[in-house]
Amino acid sequence: MAASEVQGLPVDPREAGVRGVRGGIGHTDHEGHLGSFQLLATINKAAMNIVEHVSFLPVGTSSGYIAASSGITMSNFLRNRQTDFQSGCTSLQSHQQWRSVPLSPHPHQHLLSPEFLILAILTGVRWNLRIALICISLMIKDAEHFFRCFSAIWYSSDSKDCILEPLSLPESPGGTTALEGSPSVPCIFCEEHFPMAEQDKLLKHMIIEHKIVIADVKLVADFRRYILYWRKRFTEQPITDFCSVIRINSTAPFEEQDNYYLLCDALPEDRILREELQKHKLKEVLDQQQRERNDTSFHGVCMFCSEEFRGNRSVLLNHMAREHAFNIGLPDNIVNCAEFLCTLQKKLDNLQCLYCEKTFRDKNTLKDHMRKKQHRRINPKNREYDRFYVINYLELGKSWEEVQSEDDRELLDLQEDDWSDWQEYPVSAVCLFCEKQEETIDKLYVHMKDTHEFDLLRIKSELGLNFYQQVKLVNFIRRQVHQCKCYSCHVKFKSKADLRTHMEDTKHTSLLPDRKTWDQLEYYFPTYENDTLLCTLSDSESDLTAQEQTENVPVISEDTSRLCALKQSSVLNQLLLQGCLEN
């Protein structure tokens, strides 16, 4: 894409800023993802125009200096940032001003110039500013070249579109700006104030007028409180106590040298401040989410069938998911639901697809498109919706994809099992015939034998009961006692006390009925759900088998009295001697 192919661009670089960056480029006709390096080819070709128009640089700067500057450090660094690279390319693709270009046969050549970072900032699309800011801190030897590129852009453009970090696309389809009456944010050093929604202008003001760069502004949860904090701190101590200093024009005379200051989370105080702001923001989000959970005054209209819903927000969300297959997530994972639904409704009112965001001529065409293309859903890569999901507020600087992709198995493996807080509770098994409880099963067996003349261990041994038969027998006795019925004579009594008196007087506790009476499938189910006695029963069959194996298997000890004679008469020893004689 040559510079002459771009339509609608001013020729004068002072009016355009950078030639080949903005213009009336048509929207792509296909819906597939463009290749990453196709976009890099576009970036590189447009970035070359920066080199063509460096004649307007400040005094003492030559275009040859920029053209000859080494980009190897930048290239190596960016090759290691392939993930950030692909993310930026996806963002560029979603911008409606870009179109597909031929694939370059040598894609890595587009990494040889640092100017493409500046171009990405100027395009106004979402881009990972962290790359540019890390470059400032890591590439000290290239800092002069890097800041000369910045200066070239600032001095070359009189437009107000030149900003420090990437622009965000409008949050609403109409492209409206900030609400009137939004709080203003002061400059860190002077009395200039800017509306909260125009923080880009404040950042531009601070870097031009005061030569200070704030790293990773997008990761600051509360920008206004962040600025107010450092405004106070800079009045207490010099800026050099907090910021890294980068000197440009180092070879020029001293009066022409400039110092730029980088404020980033490498400073522990800045890191702590960002984390505290993030925690405060998370608390506000969770409080808002809890209010929405308990809110019963919600009123909303379905975006697809115009049916009205009142009560809790979950009623409307569940309706759209069930009836229209439009699922934006669980209600408990969403915050600011009313604003979220309003944003989606405005897109549909503007005849815009919720997934690919194409605009159609009428509502029927839009409905057919969303149905056939299965676009009745939101695009998870659209960062516009991130602020409506709680997961994006959990960790500082991490998106929902990064949080979900983390593998916690390694962390679980590294954690040692800690049993220091383990408390051993007594068994508290209950007698079969009365309410007596014992802490050990042995004591309970003794109690039933002495008090009720019921020897469960003897019965188990005489009848050869396995574990499952013991379970049936215990459950059978429990049920009969619960029904106040004697299992031997089948007489029913008014109370358990009368039943115990009868069974003890008649010695019926030890007179079990026939096996077919209690050895039934129905007695697999416990009479009492918390019957601890069932958990202490042993498998007599396995115990007996193990005991028989121990008794029947003979153990023959090794005879070591004739060990020397065995060695001399062994076949192996004879073969070895025969081999030696033959050799």
UniProtKB/Swiss-Prot annotation:
Keywords: Chromosome, Cytoplasm, Metal-binding, Nucleus, Repeat, Transcription, Transcription regulation, Zinc, Zinc-finger. GO terms for molecular function: RNA polymerase II cis-regulatory region sequence-specific DNA binding; zinc ion binding. One of its GO terms (biological process) is cellular response to hydrogen peroxide. A zinc finger (C2H2-type) spans 351-375, 482-508. Its main location: nucleus. Belongs to the ZNF277 family. Interacts (via zinc-finger domains) with RPS2/40S ribosomal protein S2, perhaps as nascent RPS2 is synthesized during translation; the interaction is direct; the interaction is extra-ribosomal. Interaction with RPS2 competes with the binding of RPS2 to protein arginine methyltransferase PRMT3. Interacts with Polycomb group (PcG) complex protein BMI1. May be part of a complex including at least ZNF277, BMI1 and RNF2/RING2. It holds the Pfam family zf-C2H2_2. Gene3D superfamilies: Classic Zinc Finger (3.30.160.60). This is Zinc finger protein 277. Probable transcription factor. Involved in modulation of cellular senescence; represses transcription of the tumor suppressor gene INK4A/ARF, perhaps acting via the Polycomb group (PcG) complex PRC1. It is found in: Nucleus; Cytoplasm; Nucleus, Nucleolus; Chromosome. GO terms for cellular component: chromosome; cytoplasm; nucleolus. It comes from Mus musculus. Induction: Down-regulated by oxidative stress.
